Amino acid sequence: MSEKHPGPLVVEGKLTDAERMKLESNYLRGTIAEDLNDGLTGGFKGDNFLLIRFHGMYQQDDRDIRAERAEQKLEPRHAMLLRCRLPGGVITTKQWQAIDKFAGENTIYGSIRLTNRQTFQFHGILKKNVKPVHQMLHSVGLDALATANDMNRNVLCTSNPYESQLHAEAYEWAKKISEHLLPRTRAYAEIWLDQEKVATTDEEPILGQTYLPRKFKTTVVIPPQNDIDLHANDMNFVAIAENGKLVGFNLLVGGGLSIEHGNKKTYARTASEFGYLPLEHTLAVAEAVVTTQRDWGNRTDRKNAKTKYTLERVGVETFKAEVERRAGIKFEPIRPYEFTGRGDRIGWVKGIDDNWHLTLFIENGRILDYPGRPLKTGLLEIAKIHKGDFRITANQNLIIAGVPESEKAKIEKIAKESGLMNAVTPQRENSMACVSFPTCPLAMAEAERFLPSFIDNIDNLMAKHGVSDEHIVMRVTGCPNGCGRAMLAEVGLVGKAPGRYNLHLGGNRIGTRIPRMYKENITEPEILASLDELIGRWAKEREVGEGFGDFTVRAGIIRPVLDPARDLWD
């Protein structure tokens, strides 16, 4: 990354209204408790609409019926999305049975949605069920604290089912980092769990009274897998192992994918390497990165508030030196590491502990009973007999982890009968979409509902050109906020308007290069026509082992993005 002339450490100016809201919220309480009892509306009013995000919820409505309800002079059908805090995606079978029951009985859509933040979401929770969902989660040792808004969100960890010891150590650090960076306010416990108000003053020693300037995302990564897409995240701890044992981390800071259509001051950015640290400094360094961003992040413009913009404004070296000062350490030089892929290994994998792990492909992460494919019931039946745990992956799939040889056949039988092990193409396995319509208020174009038939068409093109055994990392996101991580794909579609997308090309398979816009505001037939030609060229002209994204760059079809803060929009 090139360095800008360092700008001011703190941006002066009028603070955004979100900063006022946080300051006046009494450490995230607002009037949420009173609002819960207001039966006149299905939603939350005023500041509470945004404050509930700190408690892991977003207020949404069903956009498929919004116009119809407006004609009937009815308010939108408000319902909440709830996102669980689940560091590293590990969930017990007892917890799974509880969330299965809640989804079936107390949500509009009846589904469990696995997300690429390695957790699950409920969609369609009516206001009367909001408090019960938090209490249900608490009863099985879960919560939804800090999974949205201006905090450190769910901490991701590579779902490595093979190196069980290394995964266990990395997962423990993901949990420790998550716990260390949680808010200290008692608001969550008071409002949702009916815990008594204590006559002490709340303090937030790490996050501060107005929390972070913007969302903040953290990962723990075990090379050579980049399944968690580290370059989409603010703070990344890359595991360095010696003889299969974790000894420390390389730290990379300042990744992020969200942009705004037409706003050239916004850009996706890959994370910058800061250096290596031994394990004992992990929490101090995590805290130092977060507090530096807390103090230096831009609170006058939320579109310029993420860590990636702070790094570009003050300079990577300045930010790094401040982290060293606050943590009381000096980073060592980056230790060697490399990535070879980021997809999940679907099917059975035997771990070095001799247990088996079954990775199930779940298209779009949507767990529901479909005609002839009762995925939700199948997973519930497995949860009832499985002695190990489940692991949600950052590719929206599910691992049945720690299966002894003696239980393999029984679990495989249920999985096959439920459609959980249906054969799919390599292309489908390596494609992903965010939720988008009908529930996401920011959606500009379809994503989850568009992807299955779109991949049917891509599969046909792959077959036509004789590359059906290959794959292209392909992602669809319904708007430029980028939850579908299209801005790290080889082929990324970013929603622009209903039925229209910007087509980005030139990312790579391992997720270390941002793709550039190739065509703007085009329809599915136009996208397929472009890809038909390009996949045909790739099939004929590629070098041995050359991925589609690397080919588009080498062949001069698209210029690579080398320094996105300066050349993404060129």
UniProtKB/Swiss-Prot annotation:
SUPFAM superfamilies found in the cross-reference section: Nitrite and sulphite reductase 4Fe-4S domain-like, Nitrite/Sulfite reductase N-terminal domain-like
Catalytic function, reaction form: hydrogen sulfide + 3 NADP(+) + 3 H2O = sulfite + 3 NADPH + 4 H(+)
Keyword Metal-binding: yes
Entry superkingdom: Bacteria
Keyword Heme appears in the UniProt entry: yes
GO molecular function, one term: sulfite reductase (ferredoxin) activity
Annotated Pfam families: NIR_SIR, NIR_SIR_ferr
Cofactor binding description: Binds 1 siroheme per subunit. Binds 1 [4Fe-4S] cluster per subunit.
Top-rank EC class of the record's enzyme: oxidoreductase
Subunit structure: Alpha(8)-beta(8). The alpha component is a flavoprotein, the beta component is a hemoprotein.
Family label: Belongs to the nitrite and sulfite reductase 4Fe-4S domain family.
Function noted in UniProt: Component of the sulfite reductase complex that catalyzes the 6-electron reduction of sulfite to sulfide. This is one of several activities required for the biosynthesis of L-cysteine from sulfate.
Protein's name in the database: Sulfite reductase [NADPH] hemoprotein beta-component
Gene: cysI
